[in-house]
UniProtKB/Swiss-Prot annotation:
Protein name (record): Phosphoglycerate kinase
Record has Glycosyltransferase as a keyword: no
Binding site for ATP: 198, 315, 341-344
Family: Belongs to the phosphoglycerate kinase family.
Pathway: Carbohydrate degradation; glycolysis; pyruvate from D-glyceraldehyde 3-phosphate: step 2/5
GO terms for biological process, alphabetical: gluconeogenesis; glycolytic process
Keyword Amino-acid biosynthesis listed: no
Gene3D superfamilies: Phosphoglycerate kinase, N-terminal domain
Organism: Buchnera aphidicola subsp. Schizaphis graminum (strain Sg)
Subunit structure: Monomer.
Length: 388
């Protein structure tokens, strides 16, 4: 990669604009999970130590562009960081055009970039306004690296120096570790609702993995190739594509038994049945015990594990066993494990295995697009800026 790295630049006394990912769940002004903030902190702390003048940009949620909405404000994150970085002076501004002077080693947090008209459409004028705020732009938001927006892409055209932050570099290096010359056997676990959103990822992973395990609605679409699956969530239009993929690689583990229920409900009781024996009024909501046992056996032997998505409706107590047992098997594995995607992070939090996964990615869409082999717009921007 031909790009600049923040750690290789002299940032002392310079105004640096860090585009980070502080898109955390907030309920009634209270942060529900600080995982992304904690991931972003080391970069901020390096900048403080180097006595840079630090300006922070981030998005939060999906507000209506141009409209301030309190529930999407970064103010709770500003308050969180004030408590976390007690020795550092931190300021907050609700307008990126409002001039706020800060000294070396101080931080200015700007309001949610998605309140700014033109952010999502990569508006040139907004990109210029961001560029005018700094001497150096630091792209550190891997979770937004797949978005061609003003604060993640457009700014690179107008800022003199754009560089990659330590978190972004770490994300890329760890994904490459899993995807290029992984220690074998390599196992990929892909769960979630829709094959359609992850088909290209499945195709890529099936080609490079020794075994690929599918779960959730994705597994149901594979099951529907040869079985009647009642009212289970699946995508009929993708059954033929799933069949071609299965037949081409012959390394996809499809559930031999499943936990089923008659109603999609938190209190629904489960029955374990062979996946070939599902009734019309039943829906598959988790893996069965035989399948779980088979998967755990595979995971015990693996040296590299890439994990994206739960394998069942883990939010329902009676349908979380598959996801829980797989999560714990990954945690007990001594090889290299990497996990990514919003629901995957929720599972990791639920079963308290954060410290037992080798690397937890902050990316969802970016994580999947990188696996697919797509060039992420943020990486393209950094390379173009390097050659300016």
């Amino acid at each position: 990669m031909n790009l600049r790295k923040m750690t290789e630049l002299n940032i002392t006394g310079k105004k640096i604009l860090i585009r980070t990912d502080l898109n955390v769940p907030i309920k009634n002004g209270v942060i529900q999970s600080d995982a992304r903030i904690l991931a972003a902190l080391p970069t901020i702390e390096i900048a403080i130590e180097k006595k840079a003048k630090i300006i922070i940009l981030s998005h939060l949620g999906r507000p209506k562009e141009g409209c301030y909405t309190k529930k999407y404000s970064l103010f709770p994150i500003f308050e969180y960081l004030k408590k976390k970085l007690k020795k550092t002076k931190i300021y907050f501004s609700d307008n990126h055009l409002k001039k706020v002077e800060i000294n070396s080693g101080e931080i200015l947090i700007l309001e949610n970039v998605r309140f700014n008209v033109g952010e999502l459409k990569n508006d040139e004028n907004l990109s210029k306004e961001y560029a005018n705020l700094c001497d150096i732009f630091v792209m550190d938001a891997f979770g937004s690296a797949h978005r061609m927006q003003s604060s993640t892409y457009g700014i690179g055209k107008f800022v003199k120096i754009a560089c990659a932050g330590p978190l972004l570099i770490s994300e890329i290096n760890n994904l490459k570790k899993a995807l290029k010359n992984p220690k074998r056997p390599m196992v990929a676990i892909v769960g979630g609702a829709k094959v359609s959103t992850k088909f290209n990822v499945l195709n890529k992973l099936a080609a490079i993995s020794d075994t690929i395990i599918v779960g959730g609605g994705i597994a149901n679409t594979f099951l529907a190739i040869d079985n009647k699956i009642g009212k289970s969530l699946h995508e009929p239009k993708f059954i033929l594509k799933a069949k071609k993929l299965r037949d081409k690689y012959n390394n996809i583990v499809i559930p031999i038994d499943s936990r089923v229920g008659k109603n999609f409900s938190h209190k629904e009781k489960c029955t374990i049945k062979l996946s070939s024996n599902i009734e019309k009024n039943e829906e598959i909501m988790d893996l069965g015990d035989k399948t779980i046992k088979k998967i755990i056996k595979i995971l015990k032997k693996s040296k590299t594990i890439l994990w994206n998505g739960p394998v069942g409706v883990f939010e329902f107590p009676n349908f979380r066993k598959g996801t829980e047992m797989i999560a714990k098997a990954i945690a007990e594995n001594n090889g290299f494990s990497i996990a990514g995607g919003g629901d995957t992070l929720s599972v990791i939090d639920m079963f308290q295995i954060k410290d037992k996964i080798s690397y937890i990615s902050t990316g969802g869409g970016a994580f999947l697009e990188f696996i697919e082999g797509k060039k992420l717009p943020a990486m393209k921007m950094l390379e173009e800026n390097f050659h300016k």
